[in-house]
Amino acid sequence: MTTVIQHPLVDHRMTYMRDVATQPKLFRELVSEITTFLAYEALRGIKTEEVTVQTPLAKTTGRKVAEHVVLVPILRAGMGMLDAMLRVLPYAKVGVLGMQRNEETAEPIPYYAKVPPVKGDELAIAIDPMFATGGSAVDAVAQLKKARANHARFLKRRGGTGRRPFRRFPSQKPAND
């Protein structure tokens, strides 16, 4: 599943993030804030379960996340989004995928994969802010399938180069999600 965020607060941050005058510290803060917005939207349908908790006054019911999550940033750019994702999902397991772009063909070349085994009921989320042609997304989902992920999502920020960012990905997304 691909979630595209259209929100004025994200657009505002993207403008400053793209500005060549933005200092590295502010850039990292903006990436973190945008990732938090992306995470909230991408996880809107995450499975929850009802639980009973004791408040200072009485017992009450609430909801807790029932779905186990594996976060898989694509090296290196996806690492900048990982801390924000872990603030939203502190219990998530983490793996990494390494890919580089073939400059002649623009195809991704995988060079590293360290993904924990994904159980059938776990949600695997690939994280990558760079999304030009969709090639790395297709390859990331293929790597997650190798780790036995039944449910995979790809989290990215919109607005990279302005070139057809979803050219390949929609036709090759996982059949089950």
Model-derived regions: residue spans:
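PRPP-associated nucleotide enzymes
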Residues: 1-177
